[in-house]
């Protein structure tokens, strides 16, 4: 039977007839697949015109939800409704006999029936993967030619439909290794907005989700499939509207994803073909274990491919892999044979410095490196807030990023620093995972990381890519040198850097005078001082980072106080490591409302 093009009027009549039917059934899987191919062929001309139009409209700055989602579905929003609606099926031609056959058949070809190109030998370049022309063109426009090890070993089995548990150090190219197979699968199955979501990527932080979204935007520049992002802090109603219209590739943070799965009626995810869990160890560390279990339980498991990536393999990651992956997954570890746990182009050092000299050294270092791109890590939001206010006040401009900021502020700061050629970003560990910030020269760990894994992820913000170069510097107090043994056990090579005393600018007296006279800086300094002690008291390596060994007079001088201010640190001292994790604080942020502790009395 020849394939004919439908006019919009004819298609509208068929659509009305389909919506007006009373319980008409779907096609069998064979007929559905056959009809889908016919429909795709018949609409080839229309799709081509749409793609040209979308190409013209492509914007440079990624928004929280790409405009393309609404452009692709503007003429057919009524076809994607609730999850069990008939209207979410592909628009295939049906006669009355076929309609009455079955109501439980899939609407898209299964992955088992799909034959994606495979390569027998391990490829070296993207052109050897037999990817679609659209994907190859996008990769070339992104400037990539040769694959990294995780891409060489991960992409072929993923394109063949295998479940994969991948372990690779930060900066190894994991994002493309799971996005390329996902995009190719959506393209091969000819996903359309009315089919709903075919791939979900779960990310631990909003910034990492935005970054993955940006890569997906570039990779799908020549594809007609839709993509979007749902994250905490964004407009939930706007997200729900876009999901109802149809988002084929969805990037999400766990809490917001679970919210939409449970409460957004028009969110069609029954056609899900692939689930990607990125930075799984961090997702579980910050208290999303229950959410991830619920997400995996809600999502359809039959005919679903799962890709789980984690820089470190923990017991919790193994448990998540057990419930989410199909039996017999492929395990890829590209780091186990490496001599060091950090990338080769990274020069790593530490400096031993007393508490009262730490800020002076940081100030001197930043002053001497104004032309460099630097990230400075702190242990708490209040420490970031205080140092940002102080440095900007004394004309040393910095950007700040932490979990207490509103999402729009965080997003703007992230992209501003990404686009900057030089400058300083001071932040909590919210920026320590997965973020690909271009051309970072120095990573400064002003406050100590919680463990060697956090150290590795912090320094992973520099020396990224195959031939990336960068430097890192960690501040240690004399009582903290025991941390070096933990780094050595984790295969992290560090050497001691020395800074001559004559090169350190002594601004201590001016600092104390400023903090004493400026009410707002004084209050901010006191909050930072308190939060620093709280974070130190709740450190996981208490044998090394013992709050009782701190010289509080010297610590106070580092915050601009001649004598230690009176602060209550009972919250930090009483907060166990497990409680800190399960509270889901945003990488250093303090709870909005501190718990009330019952005062002990003699009657107790």
UniProtKB/Swiss-Prot annotation:
UniProt motif (DEAD box) ranges: 278-281
Protein's UniProt keywords contain Cytoplasm: no
Gene Ontology BP term (one): rRNA processing
Coiled-coil region: none
The keyword Nucleus is assigned to this record: yes
Biased composition, class Acidic residues, residue ranges: 73-86
Subunit structure: Associates in the nucleolus with the 60S and pre-60S ribosomal subunits.
Domain comment in the entry: The Q motif is unique to and characteristic of the DEAD box family of RNA helicases and controls ATP binding and hydrolysis.
Name of protein: ATP-dependent RNA helicase HAS1
């Amino acid at each position: 039977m020849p394939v004919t093009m439908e006019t919009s009027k004819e298609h509208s009549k068929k659509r009305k007839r389909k919506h007006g039917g009373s319980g008409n059934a779907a096609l069998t899987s064979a007929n559905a697949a056959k009809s889908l191919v016919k429909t795709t062929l018949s609409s080839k001309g229309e799709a081509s015109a749409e793609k040209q139009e979308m190409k013209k409209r492509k914007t440079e700055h990624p928004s929280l939800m790409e405009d393309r989602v609404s452009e692709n579905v503007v003429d057919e929003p009524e076809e994607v409704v609730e999850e069990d609606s008939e209207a979410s099926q592909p628009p295939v031609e049906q006669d009355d006999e076929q309609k009455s056959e079955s109501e439980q058949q899939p609407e898209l070809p299964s992955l088992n029936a799909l034959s994606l190109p495979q390569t027998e030998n391990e490829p070296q370049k993207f052109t050897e993967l037999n990817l679609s022309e659209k994907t190859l063109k996008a990769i070339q426009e992104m400037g990539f030619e040769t694959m990294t090890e995780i891409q060489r070993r991960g992409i072929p089995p993923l394109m063949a439909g295998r479940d994969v548990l991948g372990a690779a150090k930060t900066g190894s190219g994991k994002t493309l290794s799971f996005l390329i197979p996902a995009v190719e699968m959506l393209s091969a199955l000819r996903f359309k907005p009315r089919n709903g979501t075919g791939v979900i990527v779960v990310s631990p932080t909003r910034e990492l989700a935005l970054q993955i979204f940006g890569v997906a935007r570039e990779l799908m520049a020549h594809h007609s499939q839709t993509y979007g992002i749902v994250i905490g802090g964004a407009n939930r109603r706007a997200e729900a509207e876009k999901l109802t219209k149809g988002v084929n590739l969805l990037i999400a943070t766990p809490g917001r994803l679970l919210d939409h799965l449970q409460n957004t009626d028009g969110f069609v995810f029954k056609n899900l073909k692939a689930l990607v869990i990125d930075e799984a160890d961090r997702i579980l560390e910050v208290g999303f274990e229950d959410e991830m279990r619920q997400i995996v339980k809600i999502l359809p498991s039959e005919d679903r491919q799962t890709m789980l990536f984690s820089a470190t393999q923990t017991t919790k990651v193994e448990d998540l892999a057990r419930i989410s992956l199909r039996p017999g997954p492929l395990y890829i570890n590209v780091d186990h044979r490496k001599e060091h746990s950090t990338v080769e182009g990274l020069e790593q050092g530490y400096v031993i410095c007393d508490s009262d000299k730490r800020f002076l050294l940081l100030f001197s270092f930043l002053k001497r490196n104004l032309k460099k791109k630097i990230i400075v890590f702190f242990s708490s939001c209040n420490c970031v807030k205080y140092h940002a206010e102080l440095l900007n006040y004394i004309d040393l401009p910095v950007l700040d990023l932490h979990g207490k900021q509103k999402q729009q502020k965080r997003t703007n700061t992230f992209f501003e620093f990404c686009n900057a050629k030089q400058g300083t970003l001071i932040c909590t560990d919210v920026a320590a995972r997965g973020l690909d910030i271009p051309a970072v020269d120095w990573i400064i760990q002003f406050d100590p990381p919680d463990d060697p894994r956090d150290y590795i992820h912090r320094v992973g913000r520099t020396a990224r890519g195959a031939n990336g170069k960068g430097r890192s510097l960690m501040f240690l107090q004399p009582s903290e040198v025991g941390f070096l043994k933990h780094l050595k056990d984790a295969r992290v090579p560090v050497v001691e850097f020395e800074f001559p005393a004559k090169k350190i600018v002594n601004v201590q007296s001016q600092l104390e005078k400023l903090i004493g006279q400026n009410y707002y800086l004084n209050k901010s300094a006191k909050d930072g001082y308190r939060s620093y002690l709280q974070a130190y008291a709740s450190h996981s390596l208490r044998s090394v980072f013992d709050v009782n060994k701190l010289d509080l007079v010297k610590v106070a001088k580092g915050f601009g106080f001649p004598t230690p201010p009176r602060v209550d640190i009972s919250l930090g001292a009483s907060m166990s490591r497990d409680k800190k994790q399960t509270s889901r604080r945003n990488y250093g942020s303090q709870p909005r409302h501190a718990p009330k502790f019952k005062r002990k009395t003699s009657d107790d």
